[in-house]
Amino acid sequence: MEYAHNKYIKKYEFGNPYDTGAVVACIDKTAGIPERFRFDAKTDTFFYTLKEKDMVFGLGETVRGINKRGWIYVSNNSDDPVHDENKTSLYASQNFLIVDNGKDVFGVFLDNPGSVTFDIGYTDANVLSIHPEYNDTSFYVIEGASPLEIIRTFRELIGKSYIPPMWAFGYGQSRWGYKTAGDIREVAAGYKELGIPLDMIYMDIDYMQDFKDFTINPERFPDFENFVKEMKTEGIHLVPIIDAGVKIEEGYDVYEEGKANGYFCKKENGEDLVAAVWPGKVHFPDFLNEEASRWFGEKYKVLTDAGIEGFWNDMNEPAIFYTEDHLKEVFAQVKEFEQKELDIWGFFDFKDVVGSIANNPEDYRRFYHEFHGQKVRHDRVHNLYGFYMTKSASESFEKICPDKKILMFSRASYTGMHRYGGVWTGDNCSRWSHLLMNIQMMPGLNMNGFLYSGADIGGFGGNTTEDLMMRWVEFGIFTPLFRNHSALGTREQELYRFDRKEDFRHLIELRYALIPYIYEEFIKAVEHNEMYMMPLSLYTGKMSAAVRSKTSYWQERH
């Protein structure tokens, strides 16, 4: 255990906090209510009176600007690809924020893995309220002379950030729709022909046999191990996706082993939860169960033995297309609607029923984990699921390939996962507003230790344009994770497909010229618990400039 400086941190406990793994330091508990805050025991809500010049920033991967004042943010990892500035929850939950008015500054970290609502001057312009759905909370107050000092102290509290291999700072091309080895060869050849550097090609779900984790479709990817070697001779690493759901199929080894050993999440009656994602019906591994976590992590060996050195974990909020139980309820309700005349209100009720199938909140209350010897309902620890899936893989890599650095990043996350992998910001869209969102998210992610991070360059959903892609690449040059990714059915957006091919080549060449500097600064930020990308206002200490400098960053350290 590392020991932080207690004079800078005070820890308050409410209810029965879970040992989430977010914190690596030992902090003595302080009795009472957090300084500066008022606590309403009836509603389990903490209140802070905002001063006129208070700015609030942090909360990691969230919408809107760097100054979070004026909106509601809910830490509740959600599979929501059609997100905009009106959303309250995205794929990640990182409950660290700083309040600063230029004279008084402090930080707050709420270690609570359930849903937490931060109302930052939305309901009442002068009040910051923090409401955990279940108040089993470790509440940390962090003091310091400046925001940067508070960030460094917080980062000491949560531990050093993940460092990927150096090649992971190169340019990566991805698309949901590369279905065969031939498709991937075509992409590699397209970049090679134009002399555009390329280090990674990502493999989405189509490489799998029937969307089953840790399988290869032998017809689409014959002799996979030699194909991996072939790509490496071209200087390209293949990076496959791994999803959270395990297909229910007799004879499928991952399913059979998980079922036989009780490694899947269970309902209250002890039966394995049946949900659905890409393969159809699936079980979810119980990553919070240490034995199940070790088992799943060992499965990555199938791919590392074939020469794979990088992965991205997806669908690990977990996303749920439906559960078997809820689908039965919906079908029963639909039958009732068949007997009714759907007036305006009946029609809206019908739409609500049908629209409630995917990612239904009740479904997240249907299953349980074995967590530190306790049976815990999922919704109380929901935000840990993606964290513990990535932890499972990372800890396994230390055993199955101890001499290699493995690229690992995830869609869902919680504070603490930054020690095991990076993040991408999920399924964005080809919109100028989403480029802006990418720019504005980076400081919050860095504050929470997620230094290896980035967005889908050009946008995942929708059809990008050449000018949007050009501007996004220009920004992406400076983000550690630099990946162009798009969805099935959208415009193909490999850089060689656009008219201004030479301009794109020059931009990617600039990125490669900067990699030694970027990597050095990244390592410094990890070692010194600093931000790799920080707003200029944080660097200068002039927080009043934060409103005017929403997209200006500083990356030099001494």
Residue ranges with predicted function:
Residues 1-165, 175-177, 181, 188-193, ...:
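Catalytic and substrate-binding clefts that recognize carbohydrates or anionic sugar/phosphate headgroups
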Residues 174-176, 184-185, 190-194, 199, ...:
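C-terminal substrate/ligand-recognition segments
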Residues 69, 73-80, 413, 495-558:
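Glycan-recognition and catalytic regions of carbohydrate-active enzymes
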Residues 91-95, 103-105, 113, 136, ...:
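Extracellular structured ligand-interaction cores
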Residues 73-75, 90-93, 185, 293, ...:
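Short, hydrophobic/amphipathic alpha-helical packing segments
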Residues 96, 150, 154, 191, ...:
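A residue-level signal for conserved active-site and pocket-lining positions in enzyme catalytic cores
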Residues 197-504, 554-555:
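Aromatic- and carboxylate-enriched substrate-binding clefts and catalytic-loop regions
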Residues 157-174, 271-284:
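N-terminal small/glycine-rich loop or linker at the start of catalytic domains
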